[in-house]
Amino acid sequence: MAATLLRAKPKVTVSFEDVSVYFTKTEWRLLDLKQRTLYKQVMLENYSHLVSVGFAFSKPNLVSQLERGEKPWIRDDGMESAARSCAGNRIKTKTLTSKPKLFGRGLLRNTSRSSLQRRPHDFRPNPIVRYQHSRIADKRYLCQQCGKSFSRSFNLIKHRIIHSREKPYECSECGKQFQRSLALLEHQRIHSGDKPYECGECGKTFTRSSNLVKHQVIHSSEMPFVCRMCGKVFRRSFALLEHTRIHSGERPFECTECGKAFSRSSNLIEHQRIHSGQKPYICKECGKAFKGVSQLIHHQLIHRGDKPFTCHEYGKAFRGLSGLSQHQRVHRGEKPYECSECGRAFGRRANLFKHQVVHGGVRLQHRTRGKGFQRKLLEHLRDLHGQQPQEAGEGSSAEPQPIDTNEKPQVCERCGQVFENKLLLCRHLRIHDDEDDKKQKPVISSTSVLEDKSLLSQHLEAQPTEESDSEGSVVFVYAEKPHGPSSP
C-alpha cells in the first residue's frame, strides 16, 4: 500500500515554498545554536520528502546553501528573488514580500516558545503563520487505520509506511533498509565518513544533529535533570533514568543464557561475552584480548607504568580505583565484608572467602606430602606445583594434575622473570612492592626490641618445632613455657 502511494503522484500540487521558511541576517542572529541546527534539519528533510514522492523541480538555493554548510540567511531586498527561486509557487509573491521581515519569526514561533517568552517585544502578528495555522487546522488527509489526520498528503504517505512496516529506502553500500529517507541519509554518512555537524566549542564533528545537541550539553554547566530521591543532578535524561534504577532496584536487562539481570544494557552486552567467549577489545602492545573496554584501559596502565590513583594520606599510588579503595579502608578502619557465621568482618572480600573455609570444616591436605592447610592450599599448590587442591580423605596416590590454562607466559618488567600465568606474576610482583616498602620504612632489629633476656627467652620458646606423625604428615608444635622450677 505504501509503495503504491510512493509511486502515485498526489493530486494536490506542493512546492518547496510551501514548506520552507527564510531568514534575514538580523533574524538569523536571534537564533541560538539549537534552533539553527533544527532549522537546517527540517529544511533538508522537507526537500528530501518532496523528491521522494515524485515532485520534479530544480534544487532551491536554500537547500544548496545548507548542503554546502553556508549560512542560509538572505538580505531583505533578496526576499522577493528567493520567493521566485522555486517554480510552481502556490503562495503569491505579493503575499511573500508584503512582510519581508516576518519570515524567520514564523519558524521561531513554531519551534521555540522559550525564545518568544524571552523576547516577546521582538515579534508581531504574522499573516503567513496565520495562513499556515489555518491549513493545519484543515486536516483533509485521514489515515484509515488509526484515524490520524494530516494537512499535507506526503505526511500521510510517510505515516502509512509505519503501519505497513515497509522500508522502501535501501542503502546501496550494505543493503540496510529504512522507513524514512532522512534515516537513510544519516546512515550513509557512516560509509562516507561525512560529519557535517561541528561543535563550535571543541571542534568535534557528528553525523547527526541530535548527537551534536547532546554533546553541547557537556560544555554548558547546566544539569537540568534532578533525582527526586537523593537530589543528584545529571546532564542527560538517560543518565538520570539509569540512576533511578539504583533506588528502585529495577533490572530490566536480563541475560537469556543464565537469567542474570542488569540495570544497564551495556552491562548486559559485556556479560553476554562471557557466554560467547567474545573478546573484541585487544591490547596493541601485547595482543591480549578483553571482554570490556574498561578492562582494556586498566590493562594498558601496566604497559605505561601509570598509577593514577594516589592515596592523599601516605602518597601510595595504585593502578586501579579498587586498589585505592581497599587501601583507604585500612586508614578508616572499615571492614564491609562480614562473615554470616560468626560476625567477623574483613576489609577485603578475598580474606572473607579464606576465613569461611574454617566454618566449612573442610581441611584441605597436600596429596603428596600430607601437609595440612586450612586457608592457603590453593595458593601453595599453584605457586609450587601448578596443581588444583584436593580435600582431605581423597586418595593420596593420584598423580599431580596441572592447571589447564590457555594464558600466555607472563614476564615481570622489573626483573625479567617468566611465569606460567598471571596469578604467579601477581604474587611475584608483591615481592617488589614489599622491597619498595622496606626501603621507605626504617628497619628495627629484633635484638633492639628483645633487649630483656626474659623477653628473649619467651620469644624463643614460642618458636615452633617440626615433628612428624605416624602418617608422615608434617605437624608444627609450639613449646609451652614451664610454669614451675625446672627439675634437676
Curated annotation (Swiss-Prot):
Role played: KRAB domain-containing zinc-finger protein that represses B1/Alu SINE transposable elements and modulates the transcription of nearby genes in a tissue-specific manner. It regulates glucose homeostasis and lipid metabolism by modulating the expression of the endocrine cell-defining transcription factor, MAFB, in pancreatic islets and, the fat metabolism regulator, ACACB, in adipose tissue and muscle.
Disrupted gene: phenotype observed: Mutants are viable, fertile and do not demonstrate any gross abnormalities. Males have lower body weight than their wild type counterparts beginning from 6 months of age with a slight decrease in fasting blood glucose. Male mutants have altered body composition and elevated fasting blood glucose on a high fat diet.
One CC-aspect GO term: nucleus
Species annotation: Mus musculus
Any Gene Ontology biological process: regulation of DNA-templated transcription
Similarity-based family: Belongs to the krueppel C2H2-type zinc-finger protein family.
Swiss-Prot/TrEMBL keywords: DNA-binding, Metal-binding, Nucleus, Repeat, Transcription, Transcription regulation, Zinc, Zinc-finger
Annotated compartments: Nucleus
Protein's name in the database: Zinc finger protein 92
